[in-house]
From Swiss-Prot:
Protein name: Formin-like protein 15
Superkingdom, natural source: Eukaryota
Record domain FH2: where: 340-768
Organism expressing this protein natively: Oryza sativa subsp. japonica (Rice)
Ranges of compositional bias, category Low complexity: 97-118, 209-219
Stored Gene3D superfamilies: Formin, FH2 domain
Signal sequence interval, chain numbering: 1-18
Length: 788
């Protein structure tokens, strides 16, 4: 490829030279042709014979001389130009003839010797300045630079090509001298050259070490290693390919000295044991430990051990050195690997602290870590193991418990649906009572000991008819094989009519709260009716709205009305005035505010204009406070608006139906017999039944009274339209919504009154003194007359 580029560059050189020659002939013709073959620039297109004599142009300055340029020449001085003397009148003809002859002669010579100046020459000298940088531009042109750069680029390309060829040749020579991987593998695996390879793992955090050695089987220092126990096996995360490892081993064997001079490298330290399994207390812990893995297969001749990855495609294991090769940091007097493994297995695995280990300083200078080695400070390892135990250990322990539970559950007999059984188990864990306490409370009828929430939970656990039959038919000797949900339900079903008892006890537990709610609701309805019918201010608002509406509806079918439905109160804010801000409700409230304020404050003749303004503002303020208090007067109306008549009626019906269920449970209990549990249940239920019947009768009477008052109140405001009401309590809802709108309008009216009062006070302060004197003068004159 590089040779092709060089050939292209060599072909481009003649082309560039030809282009340069053509460019030079076009732009620099004086170098390429002889003088006289072309008309000079200053020669005229036609001779000027009768042109008047003009003074000669000034001589051009000498061109600068550049001796270092190739085409430069020393400057030459122009020849002197002589001006001919003017001739007399007699000799005019001869002079003209001589001038014509001279002009004819000078047309073929240079323009510098012509006695007659030409227009183009004079114009060129006057309009165009003279530049002397043409030689320098010609020398530094792009074509010359291209001519110089192309050879330089060609030389550099040739040098690079030569270097590349040299490198390729050297690489081929080196590759020919090395043996192929297949031949190396054959040599290593041959019977005569069997090799013992030792592999291990050691990362930068000190978990192990890696050592690979390859030598002949005749070496006295190295011998085949047996397989290690299971806890010292460790899976390598990244394993090189088999061919690469054997190739490297063969290369090392080829460069290594004879076996007699080879000293084995120090064996790596043993890797840390795997995390121990948590102790188990169930039956699974009594099982025997798993057997160790089988030994590694031998080589073809059976003379040595090969790593596992050379014989089968499985995860390699870490093989330690023999017992004779002791790590320099270890001592033979220390504990055996089995004891260390047992000690490490008893310790739980902790969460890692990620840091970067620091190697000892190569300079030998003391560091802070050297001082800390002699420190007597010790940490509480038990607390560390408790606080920072690894999540994997926790999961392992939980998995062990789950496996034990699963093993037990596999032997359990499932009667309920799995999802229902799980839900019941969750409910049982949420209960604060045991199975025995629940059964005793159901037998005695003690609803207060269980509570409403627990009884509701029990009622949700009620099985279907088929599930109840299966649980009752289950043998008593096989109850231990049932799950927690099934065993609990079987114990509850052992009680006669258990879930009927639960329903009756739940009714008893909720009876008092239900009765109190109904009584309070009916009392609220009665109070709301009384407030709405007896509110003077509400009636005054209705009067103001009626009169305002009749005035606005004059001449229409809606005029001259004597009453209106209260729904029209909500439409007052939709009728806006001419300014687009004031609504009809604003107007009604302002009128009522003035009326209420005037009735509260005593009226009298004001002494001056300022006191009159103050009295008017105070009157509006007092009246607005009275109107805004209407929402507080009708508080029970707001509460009644939030009630639902259907809900109240259903609650009363449930109370009546619950009494019938209590009576049914009591009759079933009388059929059982007269044991202690039946007597206690009958006593508690019978006493409650008498009280419940009286309470229900009172609630039903209060319900009828409250609903009759509501109908009367609706008729009091709506007349015969009460029959058209779809909801009995709708009148309270309308009044509640109107009170909400009324509160907003009262706030707007209060802000408007404050702005009006401030503006009036400012106008009074800015009024002239004479106007204020005139305003005070009538009152003062009256005082004088009265005193006289």
């Amino acid at each position: 490829m590089l040779a092709r580029w060089l050939l292209v560059l060599l072909l481009l050189l003649p082309v560039s030279w030809c282009h340069q020659d053509r460019h030079g002939r076009r732009h620099y013709p004086r170098r390429w042709r002889s003088s006289g073959s072309r008309r000079e620039l200053h020669e005229p297109l036609f001779p000027l014979e009768n042109a008047p004599a003009l003074p000669p142009p000034p001589p051009p300055p000498p061109a600068p001389f550049f001796p270092f340029l190739p085409d430069s020449a020393p400057p030459q001085l122009p020849p002197p130009v002589t001006t001919p003397a003017p001739a007399g009148g007699a000799g005019d003809g001869g002079t003209d003839a001589g001038a014509a002859a001279t002009g004819d002669a000078s047309s073929s010579s240079s323009s510098s010797a012509s006695p007659h100046p030409t227009a183009p020459a004079n114009i060129s000298y006057m309009a165009m300045p003279i530049y002397h940088s043409a030689p320098l531009r010609s020398f530094l042109s792009s074509h010359r630079l291209l001519t110089v750069l192309l050879p330089v680029a060609a030389v550099l390309a040739a040098v690079l090509a030569a270097a590349l060829v040299y490198l390729l040749t050297r690489r081929r020579r080196c590759s020919k001298g090395e043996p192929h991987a297949a031949h190396t593998k054959a040599v290593l695996l041959s019977p005569g050259n069997s090799t013992a390879l030792y592999d291990g793992d050691h990362d930068q955090h000190g978990r192990g070490s890696t050592a690979t050695a390859a030598s002949s089987a005749s070496s006295p220092e190295l011998r085949p290693m047996p397989p290690l126990p299971r806890q010292f096996q460790q899976t390598r995360t990244s394993m090189p390919s088999t061919s690469q490892t054997i190739h490297e081993a063969g290369a090392e064997d080829k460069r290594a000295p004879p076996p007699q001079s080879v000293r084995p490298p120090p064996p790596p330290p043993p890797p840390p044991p795997p995390p121990p399994m948590p102790p188990r207390t169930d039956n699974a812990s009594t099982q025997a430990a798993p057997a160790p893995p089988p030994p590694l297969p031998r080589a073809g001749n059976g003379s040595g051990w090969l790593p596992r990855r050379y014989t089968e495609r499985a995860a390699p294991t870490v093989i330690r050195a023999s017992a004779g090769a002791v790590h320099p940091e270890e001592s033979p007097a220390r504990a055996s690997p089995e004891e260390k493994a047992a000690d490490a297995a008893a310790r739980p695995k902790l969460k890692p602290l990620h840091w970067d280990k620091v190697r000892p300083a190569s300079s030998g200078r003391p560091t802070v870590w050297d001082q800390l080695k002699a420190s007597s400070f010790r940490v509480n390892e038990e607390m560390i193991e408790t606080l920072f135990v690894s999540n994997s250990t926790r999961r392992a322990s939980k998995n062990g418990v789950k496996e034990a539970n699963a093993a037990c559950c596999n032997q359990e007999n499932k009667v309920l649906d799995p999802k229902k059984s799980q839900n019941i188990a969750i409910m049982l864990r949420a209960l604060d009572a045991t199975k025995e306490e629940v059964c005793k409370a159901l037998l005695d009828g003690q609803a207060e000991s269980l509570g409403t929430e627990l009884l509701e939970t029990l009622l949700k656990m009620a099985p279907s008819r088929e599930e109840e039959i299966k649980l009752k038919e289950f043998r008593e000797d096989a109850v231990s094989k049932l799950g927690p949900a099934e065993s609990f339900l079987k114990a509850v079903l052992a009680i006669p009519f258990a879930f009927k008892r639960v329903e009756a006890m739940l009714y008893i537990a909720n009876f008092d709260s239900e009765v109190d709610y109904l009584k309070t609701s009916f009392k609220t309805l009665e109070a709301a009716c009384e407030e709405l019918r007896g509110s003077r201010l509400f009636h005054k608002i209705l009067d103001a709205v009626l009169k305002t509406g009749n005035r606005m509806n004059t001449g229409t079918n809606r005029g001259n009305a004597s009453a209106f439905k209260l729904d029209a109160l909500l439409k007052l804010v939709d009728v806006k005035g001419a300014d687009g801000k004031t609504t009809l409700l604003h107007f009604v409230i302002e009128e009522i505010v003035k009326s209420e304020g005037a009735s509260i404050l005593a009226t009298g003749q004001t002494s001056n204009q300022g006191s009159a303004i103050a009295d008017d503002f105070q009157c509006k303020k007092v009246g607005l406070r009275i109107v805004a208090s209407l929402g507080g007067e009708l508080g029970n109306v707001k509460k009644a608006a939030g009630m639902d008549s259907d809900t109240l009626a259903s609650c009363v019906a449930k109370l009546s139906a619950g009494v019938s269920k209590i009576s049914e449970a009591l009759q079933l209990n009388q059929q059982l017999g007269s044991d202690d549990h039946c007597k206690r249940f009958r006593a508690s239920i019978g006493e409650f039944l008498q009280k419940a019947e009286a309470e229900i009768t009172a609630v039903q009477a209060q319900e009828s009274l409250a609903l009759s008052l509501v109908r009367e109140t609706t008729e009091f405001f709506h007349g015969d339209s009460v029959k058209e009401e779809g909801h009995p309590l709708r009148i309270f809802m309308v009044v509640r919504d109107f009170l909400t709108v009324l509160d907003h309008v009262c706030k707007d009216v209060g802000r408007m009154n404050e702005r009006t009062a401030i503006g009036s006070s400012l106008r009074l302060e800015n009024a002239p003194v004479l106007a204020r004197f005139n305003a005070v003068q009538p009152s003062s004159s009256e005082e004088e007359s009265s005193s006289s």
